[in-house]
Regions:
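Domain-level recognition of nuclease-like catalytic cores that cleave nucleotide substrates
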Residues: 115-143
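Mg2+/Mn2+-dependent nuclease catalytic core
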Residues: 82-100
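Conserved beta-strand segments of alpha/beta enzyme cores
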Residues: 51, 109, 128-130
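Arginine/glycine-rich "motif VI" loop of SF2 helicases in the C-terminal RecA-like domain
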Residues: 44-47, 97-107
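Active-site ExK catalytic segment of metal-dependent nucleases
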Residues: 68, 73-86
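Accessory nucleic acid-recognition modules appended to NTPase machines
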Residues: 1-73
Length: 143
């Protein structure tokens, strides 16, 4: 199956990540942000009908979080630390991951959570991706 549960590991406290020898590298900031989002999503998903997965097609794309409710994909969420320069590989990887995930799951509710970047909606191929700052996303009441 392309939809997996339990293969990505997250720490219940981001302080545990600080113990890693490369904790101050930029990639680590992205890992920490993804961990914060994972813990918050697990806190918000309280119903037995709601589940959290990630989606990966090896060597093709990955979606960090797939929110499923009663066997229906409700939202695709991608997390990145920097989302500033549209010409970068990172920018394209994040957008393409959401678009390919949307096509595969038939879900058009896509969110990109970032620490740095511009809060906006991006339209690509007729689909809307909501780009939100992590602080705003963490403070909203959703689910």
């Amino acid at each position: 199956s392309e939809r997996n549960a339990g293969r990505k590991l997250y720490a219940v406290d981001n302080a545990f990540i600080s113990q890693h020898e490369n904790a101050l590298l930029t990639e680590s900031f992205g890992l920490r942000l993804e961990n914060v989002v994972a813990v918050e999503l697990l806190r918000r998903l309280h119903s037995e009908y709601e589940q959290l997965y990630y989606l990966r097609k090896v060597q093709d794309f990955e979606v960090d979080f797939v929110v499923v409710e009663s066997s229906h994909v409700r939202e695709l969420i991608q997390v990145t630390y920097d989302f500033i320069d549209p010409s970068t590989k990172l920018y394209n990887r994040e957008i393409n991951g959401l678009l390919k995930g949307s096509k595969l799951t038939n879900c058009n509710n896509m969110t990109l959570i970032m620490m740095r970047g511009e809060k906006r909606d991006i339209e690509v191929n007729g689909k809307i991706i909501h780009c939100v700052l992590a602080a705003d996303w963490l403070l909203q009441r959703k689910y």
